[in-house]
Amino acid sequence: DGLEKIGMETGPLAVWLWNELKKRAAPIVCMDARHANAALKMMPNKTDRADAAGLAQIVRTGWYKEVSVKSHDSYLIRASLASRDVLVGVRVRLENQIRGLLKTFGVMFGKRVGGFARRAEEIIAGELDVAPEMRMIVETLLNARNDINEKLKGLDKRVRSLARTSAPVRLMMSVPGVGAITALSVVSAIDDVKRFRRSSDVAAYLGLTLRRYESGEISRTGRITKRGSKLTRTHLYEAANALLTRNLGQSDLRDWGLRIAKVSGFKKAKVAVARKLATILHAMWKANLEFNPKGAVA
């Protein structure tokens, strides 16, 4: 009784605390930890009790930036995507380890029709005479890679199932280069289409806008801010890469990106297209419209 508002910072347990307190109809707000930390730095003593008192003062005065906590379903989607990303990373490290070990003994992996596994089996069968003891090591690493692939198949099946049941995801997949993973990543990062009044704000939220520094006569533009979800930012960059480098059909967006590539190089063009994709995907979701290849790109 008498409880007016509860304030907490973003952190590892913030989602669980938020959901549990919401179930109890508690008047809770989740604050941006960076903003709260700036205020707490003014406290003379750093203790848990002092931090709690400082947070209470921040909530009382209203001097905080409220953070939107995503829904349970969005976090489940992101858990699947993050787990898949970890397994893909482990697979790449295993492949690089196998290549590196074989190169030490003069065996060049190269590329073969049929993929990595077939080439590794060829090497195990007939190219390790100079170091027979390496067969067991390579087989162990290859078996681990095969196990990872089996787990990835299960996660990919779940991702495809989630994509089929989501109307916004199917809508976003009408954009060339945007697959189920990228679309799910964007939808789960935004969570609520009404969260952003302007579609252009999504690019800033995902850390794809350029840093700006102005002071007196100094004015310069830096690299992208890289705030927000690194995973979704990476997915958008990969989608931009596919759009620009694969033959996925002509569109004004692709032509725009290629013009930037001619002037500034492909790396900057991919970042620019990823930034534009973030805006376009939100606008499509908001308007419930499929991608228009001849849509204006401003």
What annotation goes with each model-predicted range?
Residues L171-S174, A180, L184-F266, A298:
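Phosphate-backbone recognition surface of nucleic-acid-processing proteins
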Residues S80-L171:
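Glycine-rich, often acidic, oxyanion-interacting loops/wings at catalytic, nucleic-acid
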Residues A56-R60, L81-R84, V88-R91, E95, ...:
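Short, amphipathic alpha-helical segments that act as regulatory/interfacial helices
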Residues D1-V29, A38-A39:
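Glycine/alanine-rich phosphate-binding loops at beta-alpha junctions
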Residues L258-A298:
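Basic, amphipathic alpha-helical segments enriched in Lys/Arg and hydrophobic/aromatic residues
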Residues G62-K65, L94-E95, L152, D191-R195, ...:
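Short helix-capping/linker segments at secondary-structure and domain boundaries
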Residues K22, I28-A79, V86, F116, ...:
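Short alpha-helix plus adjacent loop in nuclease-associated cores
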